[in-house]
Amino acid sequence: MGTEFNGLFDEWAHTYDSFVQGEDIQYKEVFAHYEDILEDVVNKSFGNVLEFGVGTGNLTNKLLLAGRTVYGIEPSREMRTIAKEKLPKEFSITEGDFLSFEVPNSIDTIVSTYAFHHLTDDEKDVAIAKYSQLLNKGGKIVFADTIFADQDAYDKTVEAAKQRGFHQLANDLQTEYYTRIPIMQSIFENNGFHVTFTRLNHFVWVMEATKQ
């Protein structure tokens, strides 16, 4: 993952929170049960947490309130600025992304929401292999993101978006790297993880992978 999405992130920073609240009809279903999704990720995490894609700090805040020690990584300067306004003054956010980041001393859980799709499947594999080296046995990866059960589910979702006139959503689904569950299952298992997938709305699944 290079810097190709940073301009998009900076542009989206000031409207992101209205998106997650369902104010954009095209993305309302993508962010359905948003608070529950964040809570599920928090509940599945433990100990020292490395968070990729802090964004505007919504998940970060819940992790801190739950007593987790959080190391935040975010590539977008605008996102970091907004998050810092919402989070405790002493909390620092480091510039970086899923593949290039400063490694904390000790990590128990790696988390992310609505972001892993910025990586190609090959990059996802590289990232998970890297995380496998960072985590001890029992360590976890908990990612919530739009993924699809199979190719048919993806095709039907894209077609439904087009039929409803949701052309921005359809374009998003076709240009970003939304993957399939069998692909992610293979990536996790090949890198020493046991993984489960839990669907929380039509688009978003929570991937909970435990290092074996």
Curated annotation (Swiss-Prot):
<feature type="binding site">
    <location>
        <position position="74"/>
    </location>
    <ligand>
        <name>S-adenosyl-L-methionine</name>
    </ligand>
</feature>
<keyword id="KW-0489">Methyltransferase</keyword>
<comment type="function">
    <text>Could be a S-adenosyl-L-methionine-dependent methyltransferase.</text>
</comment>
<dbReference type="GO" id="GO:0032259">
    <property type="term" value="P:methylation"/>
</dbReference>
<protein>
    <recommendedName>
        <fullName>Uncharacterized methyltransferase BcerKBAB4_4222</fullName>
        <ecNumber>2.1.1.-</ecNumber>
    </recommendedName>
</protein>
<dbReference type="Pfam" id="PF13649">
    <property type="entry name" value="Methyltransf_25"/>
</dbReference>
<feature type="binding site">
    <location>
        <position position="53"/>
    </location>
    <ligand>
        <name>S-adenosyl-L-methionine</name>
    </ligand>
</feature>
<comment type="similarity">
    <text>Belongs to the methyltransferase superfamily. YrrT family.</text>
</comment>
<feature type="binding site">
    <location>
        <position position="97"/>
    </location>
    <ligand>
        <name>S-adenosyl-L-methionine</name>
    </ligand>
</feature>
<keyword id="KW-0949">S-adenosyl-L-methionine</keyword>
<dbReference type="InterPro" id="IPR041698">
    <property type="entry name" value="Methyltransf_25"/>
</dbReference>
<keyword id="KW-0808">Transferase</keyword>
<dbReference type="InterPro" id="IPR029063">
    <property type="entry name" value="SAM-dependent_MTases_sf"/>
</dbReference>
<dbReference type="GO" id="GO:0008757">
    <property type="term" value="F:S-adenosylmethionine-dependent methyltransferase activity"/>
</dbReference>
<dbReference type="InterPro" id="IPR023553">
    <property type="entry name" value="Uncharacterised_MeTfrase_YrrT"/>
</dbReference>
